[in-house]
């Protein structure tokens, strides 16, 4: 597996610092549930950046990484839905909880194709929510235009997740080396878009 370069380490360090910054400053005016959800999402991004920085890309081989990384899109999407779609709060929170539970169960059971389908479904719905909701709200004028950057960040993290998923399935879209080369920059760009939005 590709070793971390100095540039990779610098990008991951800035990613971790940016995630820590967002956790420390919080989200202005957010209620308790969205604040908890965003803090969880950024906390897992902080942890991911630090683990990659310390252990290198080898830590991506751990099955636990798949389970823990599921918290990122689920937490961020729960925060967005709770904050901007009040009628969907409970149904979406139930989906997120059940989806996370299914990802854990299918990974523990080693369910092969079932685990992959479950992961793709849960990540897909959460990822589309993070990507689409901020863009829609910005286009409708419900929020400041800059909030669209959150959607762009959602698209970037979704792209990174898909690249890693296909790599893990043994069917990478790009060469494994190329995926690992772009991953640190993709994480930093994602977090930059989230924080700026």
Give the residues covered by each predicted segment.
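Cytoplasmic-side transmembrane-helix entry/capping segments in multi-pass membrane proteins
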Residues: 60-72, 91-96, 116-125, 175-183
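Structural signature of hydrophobic alpha-helical transmembrane segments
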Residues: 32-44, 66, 86-98, 144-157
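N-terminal topogenic module of multi-pass integral membrane proteins
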Residues: 1-60, 181-182, 191-196
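C-terminal ends of transmembrane helices
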Residues: 26, 48-61, 103-116, 162-173
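Hydrophobic/aromatic-rich structural module bridging two neighboring secondary-structure elements via a short loop
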Residues: 51-90
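Membrane-proximal helix-loop-helix units in multi-pass membrane proteins
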Residues: 80-142
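Helix-coil boundary and interhelical linker segments in multi-pass alpha-helical membrane proteins
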Residues: 24-34, 78-92, 133-148, 193-197
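C-terminal transmembrane-bundle signature of multipass membrane proteins
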Residues: 153-197
């Amino acid at each position: 597996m590709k070793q971390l370069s100095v540039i990779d380490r610098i990008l991951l360090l800035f990613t971790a610092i940016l995630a820590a910054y967002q956790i420390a400053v919080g989200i202005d005016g957010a209620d308790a549930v969205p604040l908890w959800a965003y803090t969880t999402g950024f906390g897992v991004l902080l942890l991911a950046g630090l683990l990659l920085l310390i252990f290198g890309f080898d830590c991506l081989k751990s099955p636990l990484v798949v389970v823990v990384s599921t918290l990122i899109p689920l937490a961020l999407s729960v925060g967005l839905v709770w904050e901007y779609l009040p009628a969907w709060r409970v149904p979406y929170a139930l989906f997120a909880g059940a989806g996370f539970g299914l990802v854990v169960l299918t990974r523990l059971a080693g369910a092969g194709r079932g685990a992959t389908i479950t992961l793709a479904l849960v990540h897909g719905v959460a990822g589309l929510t993070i990507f689409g909701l901020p863009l829609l709200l910005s286009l409708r004028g419900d929020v400041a235009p800059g909030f669209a950057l959150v959607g762009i960040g959602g698209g970037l993290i979704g792209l990174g997740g898909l690249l890693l998923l296909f790599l893990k399935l043994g069917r990478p879209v790009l060469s494994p080396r190329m995926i690992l080369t772009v991953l640190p920059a993709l994480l930093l760009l994602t977090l930059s878009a989230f924080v700026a939005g």
